[in-house]
């Protein structure tokens, strides 16, 4: 069992959720985040004054998947989250972490079947 942590553009969230649902990946956690990578923020203008924003808005999507779904899920997130044909700086990152144990709180399932 693996935990996929995808940091993506907020505008891509609905497309990612729809594409994952079509593949029967429907259990996920989403939360808002702010951060920066190589681009180190961006310049914005407010009421005629230019200022530097250090943190950019992102969305983090967490999905626990069984090993059989890992590559398919990664491929969908990567392809749907990309802006432009080749992608751009700021499109996000996908991290894959091992999960040692899964316990379903509302039931009695443990391990891969609890995912």
Named regions from a protein language model:
Residues 1-115:
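Positively charged, small/polar-rich N-terminal and surface patches that mediate targeting and assembly
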């Amino acid at each position: 069992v693996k935990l996929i942590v995808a940091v993506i553009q907020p505008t891509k969230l609905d497309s990612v959720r729809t594409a994952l649902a079509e593949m029967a990946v429907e259990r996920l956690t989403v939360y808002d985040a702010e951060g920066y990578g190589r681009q180190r923020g961006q310049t914005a203008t407010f009421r005629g004054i230019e200022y530097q924003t250090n943190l950019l808005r992102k969305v983090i999507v967490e999905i626990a998947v069984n090993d059989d779904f890992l590559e398919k899920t990664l491929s969908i997130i990567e392809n749907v989250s990309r802006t432009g044909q080749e992608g751009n700086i700021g499109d996000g990152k996908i991290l894959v972490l091992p999960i040692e144990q899964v316990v379903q709180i509302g039931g009695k399932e443990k391990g891969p079947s609890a995912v």
